Structure formats: structure tokens, C-alpha cells
């Protein structure tokens, strides 16, 4: 008889946001007259920018003409998009990242789950705690995390780096040397960041110890402070120790369009083996390229009109973040984040657990957020609210919470 990958059986429960969706659906079915405001999952609400819509329309018209029709895309991405990314996201910031070091995909989530395939099954990972759950779950599926302790909600072969109020949500360098270090900056879920000199310490640590940093920069467009790096490649030596993940979902509203990319520098090697070559081989085998229409939309993100329109869109969401953070602070909540990231990380009141506060908000304010414990054990007693709602609903949700 056939056998299954037993590692999938090790995953506790369902994926965090799937669990939330089921709980909300059950409540809505039982209370159809209630208006629920969703500030949980980080899905955008504003429409695609006009420059992007124009690019989509033009590309669709091209697909309707035999002379300009495009079939399978190049598996690593169209050159026009890879060059636009290289010029605008990297060379403009002084980072020497060439177009052929950029691998276009259908989003950062799949890349963040798939990148672990480059590493051996006995590699140890280190994650900040709390952390985006995909990093750990994908390594569980690969059989890399050891055994699960339900009481502590930790894995025996995972190195946890607590990010709490006590350390300003800035983790310490791990004492046990990991093979892979996952860093998400600006951070999801805490909304905190590192300054360049702080990030340089991590790069130096990785190079010294032979570790690879998986750097998730999905929220870099929301950085407002000048001394916070947008890319890990702004640090000296990062090209020999870091892989960077990027998304078009949060900076350009592509959650329903799907586009992202991963940077794997040619200098990143394990002995004589190039991780760049490995990822190119993996990408070519398992991915058939993002659609032409979508990649043309991605190119429009870097047009003058696209940049201006998306700057306004980011400002819209960050105004939501400011509104939530200020309002909750006035109501007596302890709040973090919301400055360089579109997330508010708040302490749950009255010693409620994260899920108790989730239920309390849903039932009494009809507002959905994300329980902090879903991001790891150090997230217990915290709660995440997103600034990606529309402004009117954000204000309404805040009024409901303050009235409790």
C-alpha cells in the first residue's frame, strides 16, 4: 500500500488564518444580522492603482492579438520586470543586485515556504518568536523541526528567538548556531524594525558562522524612518549570506493578482555549490512562470505614475495604522507597531489569552483580529490588528472596541 509523508501529520490543527475564517463563518451563520469588521488577515481593500489597471488592460489586448500573444512565460521571469526590479528596488538604493539574480514568482508566501527545499533535512532553523507561521510549518512538512511539545507549543529542533516587550521586540543573536535564520523586517506580526547597524550585526553573525538568512521584506514599502533599511543588501556582506523575499501584495495591492520575487545572489554558496544555480534549477522544474499580464502589471508599479499612486495608497493604510494605534492608546491599551509597518500589536486586557480576546472582540464588538499566540508562544497575551481595512470601517471598529 502507498505511504504518506508523515510529517504532515505532525502539523498541529489547521493553518492559523484558516482557523480564524472558520470561527468567523460559524459566528456569522449564527448571527446573520451582525456586521463584522475584519481587521485580521493582512488583505488589502483599496483597488489597484490606475497605472496598474492600464497596464493590465493593455496586456489583455495584446493577448487577444496573434501578433502580440504570449504563451508560457520564462520560468525565471520576463526580463522587462526583472530589470525594473533591479533598477528601482536595488540599484536605486545602492545595492548591487542584477536582473538575473531576481526570480519572479506568484507571491512571497509560496517562496517563503519553498525556499527551505535548498537545505538539507537535518538543517536547523531559527525563527523570531512570534513569527509568520509559514516559516515553521513549511519546515515541519519537510521533517526538519523535530518533535512538537503541545504544552510549550514549540518544536524540539527549532531555535526560538523571543521578541517581546522586554527586549523591544528585537531578538538576540542565537547562542546555538542555526543553519537558516528567518527574519521578517518590518516585522509581521509585531510591526517593529531594525536600524541598519542592527541588521549589519545579523549579517556579520551569519557570515561568521556559515548561516543563511532568509530575509522577508514584504512590508518594506511601509518604512517611514530614514535609518531603517529596505533591503538586507544595504548591509555589507549580505550577498554571501542572505536570500531576500519580496511581494507585490502589500506595496501594490496584488493579493488577488499574485506576484512576488526572490533574490538569490550569485555569491551565495555552500562550498563550491551555488544556491543561485540550485534555485534556478528548482524554479525551472516546479514553476512555469507568472502570467504575462500580471508581470506587465508588476512593471507598471515602477512607472512614475505607479510610484506616485502607490505612495498615496501606502499613506492611506498608514493613516489607518495611526488611527488605530492612537485610539487604542487613548483607550488604555498597550500598543506597539504601526510606524514602519501596517500592523498594530497590542497587549490583551485583563490577562485574557489571545484566543479569549479574539472571541471577546468577535462576540461583543463584531471585530476580527488575529490572536498573537497563533504566531508562536511569545505571542500569547498579544493581539494583531491590521491597517489594511478601509478608513470608515477602521474608525467604526475602533469606536466599537473603545466602547467595550
UniProtKB/Swiss-Prot annotation:
GO process terms (BP): lysine biosynthetic process via diaminopimelate, diaminopimelate-aminotransferase pathway
Key words, A-Z: Aminotransferase, Pyridoxal phosphate, Transferase
A family per Pfam: Aminotran_1_2
Enzymatic reactions: (2S,6S)-2,6-diaminopimelate + 2-oxoglutarate = (S)-2,3,4,5-tetrahydrodipicolinate + L-glutamate + H2O + H(+)
Ligand binding (pyridoxal 5'-phosphate): 72, 108-109, 132, 188, 219, 247-249, 258, 288
PANTHER family, alphabetized: AMINOTRANSFERASE (PTHR43144)
Quaternary structure and interacting proteins, as annotated: Homodimer.
Annotated NCBIfam families: DAPAT_plant
Family statement: Belongs to the class-I pyridoxal-phosphate-dependent aminotransferase family. LL-diaminopimelate aminotransferase subfamily.
Protein name: LL-diaminopimelate aminotransferase
Protein's organism: Agathobacter rectalis (strain ATCC 33656 / DSM 3377 / JCM 17463 / KCTC 5835 / VPI 0990) (Eubacterium rectale)
Lineage: Bacteria, Bacillati, Bacillota, Clostridia, Lachnospirales
Amino acid at each position: 500500500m502507498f505511504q504518506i509523508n508523515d510529517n504532515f501529520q505532525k502539523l498541529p490543527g489547521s493553518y492559523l488564518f484558516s482557523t480564524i475564517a472558520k470561527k468567523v463563518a460559524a459566528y456569522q451563520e449564527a448571527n446573520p444580522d451582525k456586521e463584522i469588521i475584519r481587521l485580521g488577515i493582512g488583505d488589502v481593500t483599496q483597488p489597484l492603482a490606475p497605472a496598474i489597471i492600464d497596464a493590465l488592460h493593455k496586456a489583455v489586448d495584446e493577448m487577444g492579438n496573434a501578433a502580440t500573444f504570449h504563451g508560457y512565460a520564462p520560468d525565471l521571469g520576463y526580463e522587462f520586470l526583472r530589470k525594473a526590479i533591479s533598477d528601482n528596488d536595488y540599484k536605486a538604493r545602492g545595492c548591487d543586485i542584477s536582473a538575473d539574480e531576481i526570480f519572479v514568482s506568484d507571491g512571497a508566501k509560496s517562496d517563503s515556504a519553498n525556499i527551505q527545499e535548498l537545505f538539507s533535512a537535518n538543517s536547523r532553523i531559527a525563527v523570531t518568536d512570534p513569527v509568520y507561521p509559514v516559516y515553521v510549518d513549511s519546515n515541519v512538512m519537510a521533517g526538519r523541526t523535530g518533535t512538537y511539545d503541545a504544552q510549550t507549543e514549540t518544536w524540539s529542533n527549532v531555535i526560538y528567538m523571543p521578541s517581546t516587550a522586554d527586549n523591544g521586540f528585537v531578538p538576540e543573536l542565537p547562542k546555538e548556531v542555526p543553519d537558516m535564520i528567518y527574519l521578517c523586517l518590518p516585522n509581521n506580526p509585531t510591526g517593529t524594525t531594525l536600524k541598519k547597524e542592527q541588521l549589519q550585526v545579523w549579517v556579520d553573525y551569519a557570515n561568521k558562522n556559515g548561516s543563511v538568512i532568509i530575509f522577508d521584506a514584504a512590508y518594506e514599502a511601509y518604512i517611514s524612518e530614514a535609518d531603517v533599511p529596505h533591503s538586507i543588501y544595504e548591509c555589507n556582506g549580505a550577498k554571501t549570506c542572505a536570500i531576500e523575499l519580496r511581494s507585490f501584495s502589500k506595496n501594490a495591492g496584488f493579493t488577488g493578482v499574485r506576484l512576488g520575487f526572490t533574490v538569490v545572489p550569485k555569491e551565495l554558496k555552500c562550498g563550491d555549490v551555488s544556491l543561485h544555480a540550485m534555485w534556478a534549477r528548482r524554479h525551472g522544474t516546479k514553476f512555469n512562470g507568472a502570467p504575462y499580464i500580471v508581470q506587465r502589471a508588476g512593471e507598471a508599479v515602477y512607472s512614475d505614475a505607479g510610484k506616485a499612486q502607490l505612495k498615496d495608497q501606502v499613506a492611506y493604510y498608514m493613516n489607518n495604522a495611526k488611527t488605530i494605534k492612537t485610539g487604542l492608546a487613548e483607550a488604555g491599551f498597550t500598543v506597539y507597531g504601526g510606524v514602519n509597518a501596517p500592523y498594530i500589536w497590542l497587549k490583551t486586557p485583563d490577562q485574557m489569552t489571545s484566543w479569549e480576546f479574539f472571541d471577546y472582540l468577535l462576540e461583543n464588538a463584531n471585530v476580527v483580529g488575529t490572536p498573537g499566540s497563533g504566531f508562536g508562544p511569545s505571542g500569547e497575551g498579544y493581539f494583531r490588528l491590521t491597517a489594511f481595512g478601509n478608513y470608515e470601517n477602521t474608525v467604526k471598529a475602533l469606536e466599537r472596541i473603545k466602547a467595550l
